[in-house]
Amino acid sequence: EFILIISGSNKSATKLYHQSMNLISRALIVNAIVKWFFMKIAIVRLSALGDIVHSMVVLQFIKKHYPDSVIDWIVEKRFQGVLKSNPHINQIHQVIFSSAKESKSLFLFWNELRKIRKLGKYDLVIDMQGLIKSALVARMISSDMTSGFDKDSLRESLAAIFYKRTYKIDYAENVIRRNLSLVSYALNFSVENESINRKEAFLYSAKEYVYDAVSATKKNILLIPGASYSSKCYPKEKFIELTRQIDANYIIIWGN
């Protein structure tokens, strides 16, 4: 906001007015350019493990178009480890809503939201989860713009009321394309199908790791039998059936 007070003759005042307005216009343009290219962005994707991995794909595209942007991520504490090695993330902010849910405590839930409020101001917040819980988190973050899916693109349609700007993206769309559509709309850039097909692999930057189990002569198929809930686990009988039908080098990954 500018308040311009000019005194003097009409001619000199008019000249000074135009000079002042030119300076103000230039300052506003420079400020807009700096703010746009050096954006501070917060991504909200609290859970779960596989969804976070899918969501991380958008980071490389943001950095391609806005290389000097600063990207922070808000996530449930138990899933923060999967984000740690990504070079595109500036800071990881943890929340513990799971404890509030287990204890059915509104106080704990509100306390976590208050922590989010203290993160500082962002130019843009994008809620990639689209639940009422994540939308509340996104809205609690101080920002110029909060973006998310519109009410017809969400399982919990009420979440859309917490966003300042929403985008219609088919809920049945492939999850990676759906995430990229949201981010590209929010940041005003386009993504070609070929770019999606040639995306960098998850944790592509960890070049120091050598996987001796990878075969140079056979196709390599990676099996991940674990999940955060038993209901999400693919039956072991199905894995066995798959390995019998396809001749390949199978690698199994497991963890806690």
Residue ranges and their predicted role:
Residues L4-N256:
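Catalytic machinery of carbohydrate-active enzymes
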